[in-house]
Amino acid sequence: MTQNFKSTRRACYTGYVTQAVVVNLAPLFFVTFQNEFKVSLSFLAALTLVTFVVQIFIDVAAVKFIEKTTYRTLAVFSQFTSAAGLLLLAILPKLMAPEPAIIISALLYSSGSGLSEVVLSPLIESLPTEGKSSGAAMSLMHSFYSWGQAAVILISTLSLKLIGGDNWFFLPLFWALIPVYNGLMFTRVPMAVDMDVHDNSHGLGGLFKQKEFLFVLLIMICAGASE
């Protein structure tokens, strides 16, 4: 089947839905985790911190390794890593001590989410705009996080009511279907430009010398704290 840039846009939009799943699903299980696994409130707070810190670390570290591969490869990897983390969240706590199992899962899906942050924006910006500004396309893509967040919270909450809190592990399995599907899509969709070549004129050290970057980093830290 012939793909066009509409399929690429849809894959980018769905990538932000994946991010919404990764960030918002586990907190819906906090009460369940306390009841079933007897985890502490400090552990749940640490889990939120791990999710945020890993995403920030991947955002920064990607400046180094993104030069050694392609955006397609990273897009596929980000989706499958997110899916793997969600699958492990459903399976690992049943097979080993729950606290390290949940942390391992969070490390994986947070890595995938952080990598998506780095990859999806350049991808959507590179696509032909068909008369619309690239800023409008970027804003639309980011709006899919909000739609995804609303869907994750609503569907998961209703599902927990229907199937019972003891069957919570079915939900990560269900939501993992989205990044699995999207990872497969990213293996097929066309890229607008040759994205094997990247500008590395600033480098990681150069970024930290820019006041704008430090300001945005501070805002992201504050946003993570508010979560």
Residue ranges and their predicted role:
Residues 1-4, 193-216:
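Juxtamembrane intracellular "pre-TM" segments in multi-pass secondary transporters
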Residues 72-75, 79:
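Primarily marks hydrophobic transmembrane alpha-helices of the MFS/SLC 12-helix fold
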Residues 80-96:
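C-terminal ends and interior cores of transmembrane alpha-helices
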Residues 51-53, 146-147, 220:
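Short hydrophobic/small-residue motifs within alpha-helical transmembrane segments
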Residues 2-29, 107, 211-227:
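Pair of pore-lining "gating" transmembrane helices in MFS-fold secondary transporters
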Residues 46-64:
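Central cavity-lining transmembrane alpha-helices of secondary-active solute carriers
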Residues 105-143:
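Cytoplasmic helix-loop-helix junction between adjacent transmembrane helices
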Residues 140-194:
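Helix-loop-helix hairpin linking two adjacent transmembrane segments in secondary transporters
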